[in-house]
């Protein structure tokens, strides 16, 4: 498993220690051209616009997150693993409309009617994501 270079980690640690959380999130995720675009701003913007148009949201509501954005995993269990061909691309859609639809759907599910795998998946999702504002 390839890991991120030490200089990048040192910069992240320095930012985490010296800067407000809002700055760190903006610099490393929200305001960053994701590494999957190799610095190609035009393709990045066109991709965001395409996704936003298909979902009916503003392109500012589309945020690439995770290792596809930073170039490495921020998950402490993954040891700063570098984004590679086996990595997925995580995209956050910031939308009250879609959040409410998903929230209602999730709350209305009768997990007793689902198979064990589906039931466990929904219960894990509720436990780890929903109450943090993520669906």
PLM region spans:
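Catalytic core of pol beta-like nucleotidyltransferases
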Residues: 1-87, 94-135
């Amino acid at each position: 498993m390839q890991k991120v270079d030490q200089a990048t980690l040192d910069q992240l640690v320095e930012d985490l220690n010296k800067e407000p959380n809002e700055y760190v999130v903006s610099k490393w995720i929200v305001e960053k051209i994701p590494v999957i675009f190799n610095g190609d701003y035009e393709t990045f913007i066109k991709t965001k616009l395409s996704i936003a148009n298909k979902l009916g949201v503003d392109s500012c509501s589309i945020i690439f997150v995770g290792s596809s954005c930073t170039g490495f995993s921020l998950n402490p269990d993954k040891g700063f693993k570098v984004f590679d061909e086996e990595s997925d691309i995580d995209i956050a859609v910031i939308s009250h409309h879609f959040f409410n639809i998903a929230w209602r759907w999730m709350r209305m599910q009768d997990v007793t009617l689902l198979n064990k795998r589906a039931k466990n998946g929904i219960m894990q999702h509720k436990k780890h994501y929903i109450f943090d504002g993520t669906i």
